Amino acid sequence: DEEPKESCSDEMCVIYCKGEEYSTGVCDGPQKCKCSD
């Protein structure tokens, strides 16, 4: 398993947080990210 990245590009993954779409955050899987906040 690869270690989580510090950031993700929108091409790598899209996350949803607080009802808004984000394209940055900690990678958590091939198509998921965690919110940076």
Curated annotation (Swiss-Prot):
Keywords, comma-separated and alphabetical: Disulfide bond, Ion channel impairing toxin, Neurotoxin, Potassium channel impairing toxin, Secreted, Toxin, Voltage-gated potassium channel impairing toxin
Gene Ontology BP term (one): envenomation resulting in negative regulation of voltage-gated potassium channel activity in another organism
Protein name: Potassium channel toxin alpha-KTx 11.1
Cellular compartment(s): Secreted
Organism: Parabuthus villosus (Black hairy thick-tailed scorpion)
Family to which this protein belongs: Belongs to the short scorpion toxin superfamily. Potassium channel inhibitor family. Alpha-KTx 11 subfamily.
GO cellular component, one term: extracellular region
Major place of residence: secreted
Domain comment, as recorded: Has the structural arrangement of an alpha-helix connected to antiparallel beta-sheets by disulfide bonds (CS-alpha/beta).
